[in-house]
Amino acid sequence: MSDRGSDQSSSSSDSAQHIPPKAQTILTDQRSLRTCILLQHLQGKDPMEGYNLLCKSLGPKFMEYSHFNYWFMGLADETLTLDSADRFNASQVKQCIDLPDNHPAMASKTVLQTNRFSTVGDAHRSQSNIREGRNVKGIFLSFENSELAFDDDISFDNEQDDDGCIVEVEYKDDKKKTISKKKWSLKFAMKDLSAHLNGKKLVLDDFVVIMGGWRIAQDQEKWFEALQSILHSNGTVSAKCVSFVSFMTSYQTAQFLKHFESGFLERISIDADDASVEKIVCLEQYKQATSLSLGSGMFSEFFKHIDHFKSLKFCFFGKRLSKNHIELFRDNVIAKSVNLESCTFEHLDFSEKSFLTAFNAPKSATGSFVYKANKRSFTITSEGFAYHIKKNSSNLSTIKNSFPSDFF
């Protein structure tokens, strides 16, 4: 392990001028330098914070950030020791963008991709997961406590008994599924999340954020800034399904969606506390997704932007829907969309008779009937406060009454 100047002889003399004599002694001893890196972890620093501190003491170009992160995370989860061989890919080091001259989010796209899912603050669990060769398949964040405090630099300080942030990580292999669930203060919850995301090309099935508790609404900006900071510093996340639930504005939802890989993202679940859709529907992540789930109060705004989805789900939780809205959905989505295969209205305070009438159902229809539009047919079924619409096969004589499976 050496300073960056040794890789570029033309600039080695300039780099050396900025390194204190004592620092040069450390940089020439691999074990001493690794000890300094390990010390940052033992003091509770996150990778970027530890890197910046060592830049101040050892010089701004003592090591590429991605190379530092390789050793920081390896020493933290005990997959590396002070005497381990340095197997960091040298070509990756050369490809990385220098820090701190450039924003860390840019460098995260080129850091070494590994299979190590290290967790600052829970190294033993991480080490077990690594050895067993599991893959992270889902990350679920639940914010339940509103007693949060931040300084101007968003250091994720906590006050009182702030232990209401839950980080749940799902691991899958061919034989079984394991869920690791930890309840942290916000500070350590964000460190835990960062450790799972940082420097790894994860392919997630689910990334879910749930805001629970009525008091959490007053701290929207605080947890939003915390999570936004982590996602921003770790670059693009690959996930098949993204779900943002409760006490979230459409602006915050749009900002979060930007961090997920468009084209790879298939399913989106949104439950915002406002009905503004402009920031969301213009995103490629939204345009390329195939399934959408919406919370109450958003249907009337979104129905003009949903004709490209294959699966739709609307959860109204007792909120009334006018007959006019049903007819607009019938004429603008059911009749026109060539992609729609299934749709579910859940917890809808709308009588079965009115729903059937809106779709011109025969008077004799009770519970289930077939609706035809533009040479296509749909089976519409009512079940209590739920209504299911499923596209039938092209052979109308073989229509079967069936329920669309929920995609969430």
Swiss-Prot record:
Q: Write down the Pfam families for this protein, in alphabetical order.
A: FTH, HTH_48
Q: Where is this region: Disordered?
A: 1-22
Q: From which domain of life does this come? A: Eukaryota
Q: Which residues cross the membrane?
A: none
Q: Which family does it belong to?
A: Belongs to the FTH family.
Q: What is this protein called?
A: F-box A protein 155
